[in-house]
């Protein structure tokens, strides 16, 4: 700290530069007016640098990254779990025809995965090409909108959470009634921290492999394994100054569940147990925008381990050319994830700090209600509303709408991903008439970029 008593007899005013790295002291000694200038090691740090761990918005911003990483595992696995539950609710559906699906990525890691893991994973069926029941593909998609809030505490500000995502998947049934598939998720999380403008904007891309396997007549095991890539934009606003940061991350996650269905008169009761697990790594980053106040964050590892028990209830109604199937979900979850910590320092002075025991472990209740609509034409619909409520009062509301479509033998689909841009192509041949439809979407563009193209032609 600075002691100016030996240099100024009558201090009448103190001022700081805009970045807080310079302090000016006005001394009135008799008629001699003197202004002294002092260089500070960090912004506005006259005695000591401002301790970020004592600022509720700073603490909340750090907690938000840990919470968002754990929520990402839930938001990525829920659509796949919904799909596996849908498959078992409708396991009597026969495959209509064979389809051809291709996956292309410009990312070298994902492209390598698609060329090595996908063929091995999706061809391990020992099924005959002449057996349509065991060789047809099904495409599905699910869009999710989620809103939530985590209240303030004695050390942390409140957080308002908005999440939107789309999941695209493909699966097929094997000879032993085993369903295997893959899913791609594109998501965006926006979290507002406190009341001064601090925020986290997180964009994610996830690739999931999943399998649902029978263990008898009515007992099934579901498991999935996946990888997500994370890019975050962070704003830390104190009201008078604001800093910005960019952070990348990777996440490995998995889930295993066991379900046993009890049926009577088209009414199904399915108790289940489930374990979710995962590890997230966030890279180090340095804030910009306020010299003297910018913080430098070390890399961080976040563990996730959640167990849950619950049940599903559904009942089938057979209507003309369609089936209507309403259902209800209930789950009780115990979060036993280990605590994590974040180390950081002022980039100007190097003063170091650590936020320990970042632990969002809690107990929560998950409820959901929705319905399936299954038509003979090949188009099927699933809608679902869910709510996650913790014992501490935080919550998440989700609305889900998903589609499934199976087309004719002469139909082909192609899905390609180029950085954040996605392209879906559909081609169909009817006698000598060919129909090509291509749609592209950049999910994370500031100004959404999208297009759809239709081509109809004949070959003779």
Indicate where each model-derived feature is located.
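Residue-level detector of Asp-centered blade-edge/turn motifs that repeat once per structural unit
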Residues: 16-19
